[in-house]
């Protein structure tokens, strides 16, 4: 008779059942620690990358080096202008990306967890990110935005765009990394910490590239105050025109992707892929090494 080995211990306690239709699992301590403390540190670290993207939304002519130069135009510390607001919001934001995602996924599945996490994340960080974007705009062009969006206000222009962007980014963290890791392991013939890190980064780069135009549309929306005085149809036309101006060019009667496309894909990857890969690596390390 074959011996039945005990199952490997789960990182989560036994599911608590509510009625007969659903169950959920509460995340363990290291996942909560990663979200509560690691998230703010990660989001503050990548502030210059986020500010560079913001400036790029209203400057399609500048290359990424020029945009990063503008970010640091007032000194090294100036690169972190407004970063305290997303960093503060990152505590509940990454509690959402980590513990809340695992909670949602335990009863709604991976796709449902990604959607619910993204909506919750937007409700938490929309105000802080919008405030940060407008402060970055004002640093480059003082007085451009007279009434900066309050960091505590969880709604405003571009809210739905923000949710859509987060769905793509969260999918990268929770859905794209595993197949990317598998491909790297198959190609290299190895499975170790480096292949896992590479898979995480590749998955997050994929999501960053897919979400880049959505993120820039959000930045355009929140740093263009005159949109608020336009009707819905006019706003839609301006947004479509922004995407065309940003990513398409016509030359010799032919329309093609503009040089801004690789710039924005690179800058979005530097922001999102670096931040989420740092976070996923920290979360994994804490779960593996936390005292039992």
Regions found by a protein language model. Give the residues of each.
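The first (N-terminal) embedded transmembrane alpha-helix
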Residues: 35-42, 87-95
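Interfacial helix-start motif at the membrane-water boundary
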Residues: 72-90
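Alpha-helical transmembrane segments of multi-pass membrane proteins
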Residues: 41-54
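Aromatic- and glycine-enriched pocket-lining scaffold segments that form the walls
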Residues: 170
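Hydrophobic transmembrane alpha-helices of multi-pass solute transporters/permeases
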Residues: 47-48, 91, 95, 268
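Flexible extramembrane linkers and terminal tails adjacent to transmembrane helices
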Residues: 1-38, 53-68, 76, 96-165, ...
């Amino acid at each position: 008779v074959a011996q039945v080995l005990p199952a490997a211990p789960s990182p989560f306690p036994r599911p608590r059942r509510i009625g007969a239709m659903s169950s959920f699992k509460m995340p363990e301590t290291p996942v909560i620690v990663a979200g509560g403390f690691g998230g703010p540190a990660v989001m503050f670290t990548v502030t210059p990358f986020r500010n560079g993207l913001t400036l790029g939304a209203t400057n399609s002519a500048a290359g990424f080096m020029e945009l990063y130069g503008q970010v640091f135009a007032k000194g090294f510390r100036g690169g972190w202008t407004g970063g305290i607001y997303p960093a503060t919001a990152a505590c509940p934001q990454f509690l959402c990306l980590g513990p809340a995602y695992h909670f949602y996924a335990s009863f709604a599945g991976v796709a449902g967890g990604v959607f619910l996490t993204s909506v919750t994340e937007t409700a938490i960080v929309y105000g802080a990110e919008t405030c940060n974007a407008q402060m970055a705009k004002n640093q480059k062009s003082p007085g451009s935005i007279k009434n900066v969006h309050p960091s505590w206000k969880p709604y405003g222009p571009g809210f739905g765009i923000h949710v859509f962007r987060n769905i793509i980014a969260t999918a990268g963290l929770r859905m794209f990394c595993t197949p990317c890791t598998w491909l790297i392991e198959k190609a290299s013939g190895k499975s170790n910490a480096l292949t896992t890190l590479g898979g995480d980064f590749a998955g997050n780069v994929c999501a960053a590239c897919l979400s880049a135009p959505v993120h820039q549309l959000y930045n355009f929306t929140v740093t263009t105050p005159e949109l608020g005085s336009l009707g819905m149809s006019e706003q839609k036309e301006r947004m479509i025109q922004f995407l065309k101006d940003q990513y398409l060019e016509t030359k010799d009667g032919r329309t093609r992707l503009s040089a801004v496309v690789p710039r924005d894909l690179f800058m979005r990857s530097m922001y999102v892929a670096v931040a989420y890969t740092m976070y996923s690596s920290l979360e994994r390390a804490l779960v593996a090494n936390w005292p039992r």
